[in-house]
Amino acid sequence: MIRRALVFLVRVYQRLVSPLLPPACRFYPSCSAYAATALERHGALKGSALAARRLLRCHPFHPGGIDPVPESER
């Protein structure tokens, strides 16, 4: 249930806030897409940790690149 609420919040951000901002993510997939996939694939706790780690790396001094969400261990 928490996972679904967090994914919902990310989707709201993607549809309402993100279109108003210039593209700034240095990674593919974008940080918000990464967060939604991580939450769906790994659940609220681990997915949030993966998303937070990704957001901390998304800055002008990091080269960026392709960074897929790790597969679930289940």
UniProtKB/Swiss-Prot annotation:
- List locations, semicolon-separated: Cell inner membrane
Q: Which cysteines are joined by disulfide bonds?
A: none
**Primary localization class, coarse:** membrane
Protein known as: Putative membrane protein insertion efficiency factor
Q: Which organism is it from?
A: Anaeromyxobacter sp. (strain Fw109-5)
Record's function text: Could be involved in insertion of integral membrane proteins into the membrane.
Q: What domain of life does the UniProt record list for this protein's source?
A: Bacteria
Matches recorded under InterPro entries: Membr_insert_effic_factor_YidD
**Which Pfam families does the protein's record reference?**
YidD (PF01809)
> How would you describe this protein's topology in the membrane?
Peripheral membrane protein
What HAMAP family is this protein classified in?
A: UPF0161_YidD
Q: Name one GO cellular component term.
A: plasma membrane
The family classification in the record reads: Belongs to the UPF0161 family.
- What keywords sit in the KW lines? Cell inner membrane, Cell membrane, Membrane
